[in-house]
């Protein structure tokens, strides 16, 4: 489909995704915004008093953004979108080397940016306030074996074999803790993973999946669930026959925190680059190999899928899945979690789907990449530093 007329695009997108070009106006009363620091002891067991249905009451009000009544919660079932907005920019990274370490956070395997290493910026898209985004981590999600749903987001009801999230921080905030407290302070590129079909395998994901085998263990004594008494599961079903299994959530449930309450403590913390979550596997990857070959992405506003669930994320979800090793689901499911004796495969690490709430979802096609894996960077490509939405009259 050809690029939409400027008038139609401005009317549709300006009034929906980005609204205005002044950040102060983004702070709408309905947005749930929370800083991302500390890490609560959580479970993905929907019956548990520390499960997804109760996340919003874990150390309330700090985790209040996990309230499922929020208007921009994630993940979602992405609806079928017919119209494609074509933009002239290529979506790619400023460097072919992202240096970091893989660790088991007790929630998911995460490849985190090395502290002090050069930041790798996403090029071809910017924020509505003219700022770039840099990579902070790449982490993975999977469901319970034999369950139909294996991804956090779904595509018109369809799931794949897993999902990778490439998390970016807006450069004017510097760290994830602060960025999570601002609309579009974060940008997440989501790639569906398939063991049977999809875009051809690349070393980027293959290398990360191979490393996951070396970080299966989690040091529970250093984690947020250490020395925390978890309330017994207590369900409405015990009181009302045939009622769905729902836990009774405990308000102000005690959770582990950073030692100095600032986000720079010494306990395991998913949101810190040096979160001390057990063994680390240091390496480097070419981040361009993580992006979709066919650069079509669903674009919408949403939130983090783990506490604090802040509605601060601009999501780009690739339309086509990436083919990966058949061992991917197994190595992720076999990882130990925050809770002693539990592995990810017991309950998966997928937050329940959240309501779309009439959010607009756009299908955006970036310009095809040609030789980016062979060193063709965007350093001298003038249009690559601008947001593609500037073509649509947004910036």
Swiss-Prot record:
Its main location: secreted. Residues 1-24 form the signal peptide. PROSITE patterns: ALPHA_CA_2. One of its GO terms (molecular function) is carbonate dehydratase activity. The keyword Secreted applies. Component of the acid-insoluble and acid-soluble organic matrix of calcified layers of the shell (at protein level). Its EC number is 4.2.1.1. GO terms for cellular component: extracellular region. It is an enzyme of class 4 (lyase). Zn(2+) binds at residues 139, 141, 165. Residues 42-365 form the Alpha-carbonic anhydrase domain. It is found in: Secreted. It comes from the Eukaryota. Keywords: Lyase, Metal-binding, Secreted, Signal, Zinc. Its cofactor is Zn(2+). It catalyses: hydrogencarbonate + H(+) = CO2 + H2O. Belongs to the alpha-carbonic anhydrase family. Reversible hydration of carbon dioxide. This is Putative carbonic anhydrase 1. It comes from Lottia gigantea (Giant owl limpet). The lineage of its organism: Eukaryota, Metazoa, Spiralia, Lophotrochozoa, Mollusca.
